[in-house]
């Protein structure tokens, strides 16, 4: 069938309709929280607060900055490893996150911050909205290079909605704990994305296989995303925790788990290569698995060595998943997981949910202290008869709920995205920026040492400097006055490893 990827009419109209709708809904429902309102000075006087430093902004904003950088820079650049899809990886991630945070502020506001007919907006709302969008960024990794920006916006709309419902049931009705989002963010996002890409299976995707790989510089850009995520992940897992020991503990546990996953990733990556070399895909992704795996139990008394153990096993399983499980899923189950989110978010997310359940089930006053266990798990009041085993069961139910919501929601949304009018590219044009972006003409200059140049046929590399531009290039860069070696210019396609 003919694929129409011209979005000149559809994309602008969709973006404008969505943004105008956001303006109207914000105008009707959203108001500043008292701590962000000009009447804050009256509240300070009423509560006898002497300093503006008591405002929640000063406690939460540093964590928000870190989480925000992870969503827009970390996830965006992590997906730039594809040689011809860097514009789309960063640009479409930017688009989905910008729309997603607005819709998430509304959805989460209606469920969590709704008072007297209005959503009260504060910095805490911004953190929760970023968490919600992070789940969408995870799912984006599974369909990267295979869907249009129109499909991405539709997927974001539905996923944010489902995420909010799942999170509300898990945290408020089942009353599970999930500080770092192993279940709500990573497990839900991963299996939602995997289900969508399974429904959108492309039988002729092999025709685009030459672009579904990296080159040297694209792997370096992706590593920037990895480092942003790795550095800020302790803030991510602790951002929504209670102030004090709980938040402090969440950051420490995440820090340790991340460190352990780096060493085990390097070890396994070297072991499984015949010549003991490292695979950049493993280093970019599996080194982050410790942050995912420790998420649910991050604010619990996991102990420092327990956090290291979680990171240890997450790094191993994630690396093995990239090496062996991803090819199996694609060849046997028809799951085309572009970024391998099953290995970075899916498996570690399930591990995180199980670790949280076990840690909660075996918590005791000897470890937490009687007031500490009440504070950490909310025992008391209507939960006065709540036992640690009941909390452990709640954690397992929360994990199963996230999986069920992801699978059912992914199937429904997948069939919606499968409709032919969203401007998706054909199988042979996947993973290509030029389908949706104005891409500059590329003329890549390669210096070839003279001793090597003479070993090739002069019809390919002459002994004197020569510039061979692409057929469409109108301007040829000047040759350096005295090049140290023969100069040849070739098209980008010939540089693919």
Curated annotation (Swiss-Prot):
Keywords: Ammonia transport, Cell membrane, Glycoprotein, Membrane, Transmembrane, Transmembrane helix, Transport
Tissue-specific expression: Expressed by connecting tubule cells and intercalated cells of the collecting duct in kidney (at protein level).
GO biological process: ammonium homeostasis; ammonium transmembrane transport; intracellular monoatomic ion homeostasis; regulation of pH; transepithelial ammonium transport
Residues bearing attached sugar chains per UniProt: 48
Cellular location(s): Cell membrane; Apical cell membrane
Parts of the chain on the Cytoplasmic side: 1-9, 83-93, 146-151, 201-219, 273-282, 326-340, 417-497
Ranges annotated as spanning the membrane: 10-30, 62-82, 94-114, 126-145, 152-174, 180-200, 220-240, 252-272, 283-303, 305-325, 341-361, 396-416
Residue intervals on the Extracellular side: 31-61, 115-125, 175-179, 241-251, 304, 362-395
Record field: catalytic activity: NH4(+)(in) = NH4(+)(out); methylamine(out) = methylamine(in); CO2(out) = CO2(in)
GO molecular-function term, one example from the UniProt record: identical protein binding
Function: Ammonium transporter involved in the maintenance of acid-base homeostasis. Transports ammonium and its related derivative methylammonium across the plasma membrane of epithelial cells likely contributing to renal transepithelial ammonia transport and ammonia metabolism. Postulated to primarily mediate an electroneutral bidirectional transport of NH3 ammonia species according to a mechanism that implies interaction of an NH4(+) ion with acidic residues of the pore entry followed by dissociation of NH4(+) into NH3 and H(+).
Protein name in UniProt: Ammonium transporter Rh type C
Organism annotation: Rattus norvegicus
Lineage: Eukaryota, Metazoa, Chordata, Craniata, Vertebrata
Chain's gene name: Rhcg
């Amino acid at each position: 069938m003919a694929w129409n990827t011209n979005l000149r009419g559809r994309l602008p109209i969709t973006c404008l309709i969505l943004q105008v709708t956001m303006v109207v809904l914000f105008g009707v429902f959203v108001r500043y929280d008292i701590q962000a309102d000009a009447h804050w000075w009256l509240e300070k006087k009423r509560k006898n607060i002497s300093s503006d430093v008591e405002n929640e902004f000063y406690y939460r904003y540093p964590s928000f900055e870190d989480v925000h950088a992870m969503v827009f820079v970390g996830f965006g650049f992590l997906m730039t490893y594809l040689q011809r899809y860097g514009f789309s990886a960063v640009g479409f991630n930017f688009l989905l996150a910008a729309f997603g945070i607005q819709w998430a502020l509304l959805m989460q506001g209606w469920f969590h911050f709704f008072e007297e007919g209005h959503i009260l907006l504060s910095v805490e709302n911004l953190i929760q909205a970023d968490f919600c969008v992070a789940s969408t960024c995870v799912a984006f990794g599974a369909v990267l290079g295979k869907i249009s920006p129109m499909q991405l916006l539709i997927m974001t709309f539905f996923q944010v909605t489902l995420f909010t419902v799942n999170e509300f049931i898990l945290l408020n009705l089942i009353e599970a704990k999930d500080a770092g989002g192993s279940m709500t963010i990573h497990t839900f996002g991963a299996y939602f994305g995997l289900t969508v890409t399974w429904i959108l299976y492309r039988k002729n995707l092999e025709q685009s296989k030459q672009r579904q790989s990296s080159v040297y510089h694209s792997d370096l850009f992706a590593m920037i995303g990895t480092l942003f995520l790795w550095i800020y992940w302790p803030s991510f897992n602790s951002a929504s925790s209670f102030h004090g020991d709980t938040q402090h503990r969440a950051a420490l546990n995440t820090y340790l788990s991340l460190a352990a996953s780096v060493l085990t990733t390097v070890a396994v990556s070297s072991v499984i290569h015949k010549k003991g070399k490292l695979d950049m895909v493993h280093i970019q992704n599996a080194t982050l698995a410790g942050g995912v795996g420790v998420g649910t139990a991050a604010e619990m008394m996991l102990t420092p060595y327990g956090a290291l153990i979680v990171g240890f096993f997450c790094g191993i399983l994630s690396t093995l998943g990239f090496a062996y499980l991803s090819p199996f899923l694609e060849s046997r189950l028809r799951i085309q997981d572009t970024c391998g989110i099953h290995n970075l978010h899916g498996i570690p997310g399930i591990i995180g949910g199980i670790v949280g359940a076990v840690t909660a089930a075996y918590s005791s006053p000897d470890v937490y202290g009687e007031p500490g266990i009440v504070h950490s798990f909310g025992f008391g009041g209507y939960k006065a008869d709540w036992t640690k085993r009941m909390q452990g069961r709640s954690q397992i139910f929360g994990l199963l709920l996230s999986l069920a919501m992801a699978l059912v929601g992914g199937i429904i949304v997948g069939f919606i995205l499968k409709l032919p009018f969203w401007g998706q590219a054909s199988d042979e044009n996947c993973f290509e920026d030029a389908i949706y972006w104005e891409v500059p003409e590329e003329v890549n200059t390669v210096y070839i040492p003279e001793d090597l140049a003479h070993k090739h046929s002069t019809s390919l590399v002459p002994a004197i400097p020569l510039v061979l531009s692409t057929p469409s290039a109108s301007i040829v860069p000047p040759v350096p006055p005295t090049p140290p070696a023969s100069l040849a210019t070739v098209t980008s396609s010939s540089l693919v490893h």
